[in-house]
Amino acid sequence: MSQVIDSKHTPMMQQYLRLKAEAGPLLLFYRMGDFYEMFYEDAERAARLLNLTLTKRGNSNGTPIPMAGIPVHAMEQYLARLVALGESVAICEQIGDPAAAKGPVERRIVRIVTPGTLTDEALLPAKADRALAAVCVTGKREPRAGLAWLNLASGAFHVTECAPGQLESELHRIAPAELIQAESAELHMAFEGARTRVPDWHFEADGARAQLLAHFKTDSLGGFDVEDMPAAVCAAGALLRYAARTQSQALAHVQTIAAERPGQYVLLDPVTRRNLELTQTLSGEESPTLFSLLDGCRTPMGSRLLRRWLHHPLRENEPVLARQHAIATMLTARQEGEQAFAAAALLETLRDALNAFPDIERIAARVALRSVRPRELASLRDALVALPALHASLAPLSGSPRARELAAQLAMPPDIGELLARAVASEPAVAIRDGGVIAAGFDSELDELRALATDGGDFLVQLEARERERTGIGNLRVEFNRVHGFYIEVSKGQTDKVPEDYRRRQTLKNAERYITPELKTWEDRVLSAQDRSLAREKWLYEQLLDALAQYVRPLSQCASALAELDTLAALAEHARRHDWVAPELIDGAEIDIEAGRHPVVERAIERFTPNGCRLDQTRRMLLITGPNMGGKSTYMRQVALIALLARTGSFVPATRARVGRLDRIFTRIGAADDLAGGRSTFMMEMTEAAAILAASTPASLVLMDEIGRGTSTYDGLALAWAIAYRLLTHNRALTLFATHYFELTRLPAEQPTAANVHLAAAESAGGIVFLHEVREGPASRSYGIQVAQRAGVPAAVIRQASRELERLEAQGAPTPQLGLFAAALDADVQSQAMTEQAEDAAALAQLRDQLAAIDPDSLTPREALDALYRLKQHLT
């Protein structure tokens, strides 16, 4: 929109156009009384997106101005819908006094709401973070990508650097809701969130550095360990500038930067996160996933931390062991003098105590941003009262160093609890504009104004009695409503008795309403007291927020400790209920699992068959064969999930497990086209395989399922063999390689660090029975036809397939096919190949007929020997 601001517009519309120019492409919510109004293109866009009624207001150059509006009290629900659609909104409030304004009341944009800058409880998912990220790529010869991300609802601020080719994977790990980039930046990568472009100079090194130094009030960034990350510093400075602008204030709760270094986490690429169904199923559902299974957390903070742990398994053993030891202590600690079974009761006591705590992490952030609601302060006050009980329940956990550290972080200055207890009403109103937020007795002036505004009942009763006696009107009533204020109501039949000092205020069908000088004087005093009371209460609330600002840091530390205790307790409870064990963590690259179980699948079926897995220096690859539906994919995912859980500090579903230091987990499981990107199933498969071959190391865990199935038999077999061989001899990664190419089972004969295993199945009179048991050695059959029969394929098709299978097996080799890599054959060569194939088939058919004609029971030894020589002549 580009409306010219001139005298043809009303003063109010001139003000709107100036503010709209400031908001730019954002939707502008323009406060007018009890509504937020939108005009021109904003009104048309909002009406379309929110299904609002589009009306008109005034004219612009002879054309009616489109207008749409939403009630102030319903703003949050409309904001949530707009943000979900990827829209950003500038909120303009009235900051002047309408009564004192000579022209339009003063207004200004007080906040900008974008997908990555949400802080309101109603707009945020309780169990997931919504980060704001910025990316900056620097250098031409050796380019580096700097990435910064901020969780505005908690104040957590992180930076990292990586190669530009890893940027997409890093963004998938962080999953920001919004990405900031320079206007001129060309970033060719998949990203599902909102993208926001800002001027290039926001990313300039000197300006970005100055932005960070000013925010943290320091002369050097050395204390944040980011001096050697110039690209990340540029991204962080631009991000901080953008975030502060959206909030129209400094971000006091953003108090440090955490620098993430390569090697800190076990890397999971987007394909692996999807295939392992950590927080989302393959069909996009939130359950059943590993997160939904483990999320027994009692607080939203704990749930969010658990989600982060699952997406960020740790490489180093020390922090993992600290978590593991804390969980073990929760499972074994007892109060002094209690019986052996009391460990479970102690854990339940701890978890019950955690129920008392609201989302302190986000409340602390909203205190810093001065957007905290009165009821959130009341819940914070009640939570601080519950802290001593929680602290006492942690005493038996003193054997865990990590538990002791967390208990120490729970300590809060007593002043904050006392302040909230004195200042906040026991059950405050939803918003400060409604009054009733500040507790009685906190401020004497407020108490006096409230008394004046509310203690008028006796006066009204006395006035009504006097007026009835003075006028002789027995049904005269003194009442009040919000529109007309106080009034005296007289029925139509009694209006002739009304005195001269009665002034008509409203006419109804059956009554008249009046005001008297005495009632008017009293009304002015009461309403003035109400207005002054509300103004005083708003001022006191602002003073309370000023006083609470100093406690943001200890509140954030307390929230962090509560979240970790909650997460550890949830993992401990799950381990206790489902017989999970503490894995042994070692330095070398090794996975040794005894009787492991898939954590999600075992909860979904009645009986789950446990299976072990050993991968180490002498056994780096398992070639997995077996029937379709036999459980190969489940087994592979099971191993990966157990390894991942072990690296988060959790117990694992097994009777025993030993897991080494892994650097990455790769998966190539399942088949899917990328229609939008123009990539077929086979192309997707090869792209993922190429990434694994390029990046996996001897410390990586690789899962490859049915590689090569998207092309011809010979091509697929050749590729599968070559990829397996490369992984085994060059990458030397710990590999689970599932295949239907039985030719691959010869690989262990050439490479002793490979081994064959198979998923067992048994045939019975009723068909095939899947045992789901992993056994040593290759499978003997794939049972594809039996699986098709169980799937309901028509019997005629099954019979024909069985006959065709017998024919192909009799030939002893797959039907020749033209591979993708084969040179084109001329017509003569193709004809010759087909002729030779036909001759071979005829010879085999003749041999089969002769065999069928022999009756071994009727032959003498000499006749049997002669028959054998005749058959041999056919083969030579």
Swiss-Prot record:
Residues bound to ATP: 626-633
Q: Which GO terms describe its cellular component?
A: cytosol
Stored InterPro entries: DNA_mismatch_repair_MutS (IPR005748), DNA_mismatch_repair_MutS-lik_N (IPR007695), DNA_mismatch_repair_MutS/MSH (IPR017261), DNA_mismatch_repair_MutS_C (IPR000432), DNA_mismatch_repair_MutS_clamp (IPR007861), DNA_mismatch_repair_MutS_core (IPR007696), DNA_mismatch_repair_MutS_N (IPR016151), DNA_mismatch_repair_MutS_sf (IPR036187)
Keyword match Heme:
no
What SMART domains does the annotation carry?
Answer: MUTSac (SM00534), MUTSd (SM00533)
Gene Ontology molecular function, alphabetical: ATP binding; ATP-dependent DNA damage sensor activity; damaged DNA binding; mismatched DNA binding
Q: Keyword set for this entry? A: ATP-binding, DNA damage, DNA repair, DNA-binding, Nucleotide-binding
Query: Known Pfam families for this protein?
Result: MutS_I, MutS_II, MutS_III, MutS_IV, MutS_V
Matching PROSITE patterns: DNA_MISMATCH_REPAIR_2
What biological function has been recorded for the protein in this entry?
This protein is involved in the repair of mismatches in DNA. It is possible that it carries out the mismatch recognition step. This protein has a weak ATPase activity.
Q: Which NCBIfam families does this entry report, sorted A to Z?
A: mutS1, PRK05399.1
PANTHER family linked: DNA MISMATCH REPAIR PROTEIN MSH1, MITOCHONDRIAL, DNA MISMATCH REPAIR PROTEIN MUTS FAMILY MEMBER
Name the protein family: Belongs to the DNA mismatch repair MutS family.
Task: Please identify the protein, giving its name as recorded.
Answer: DNA mismatch repair protein MutS
Q: Which gene encodes it?
A: mutS
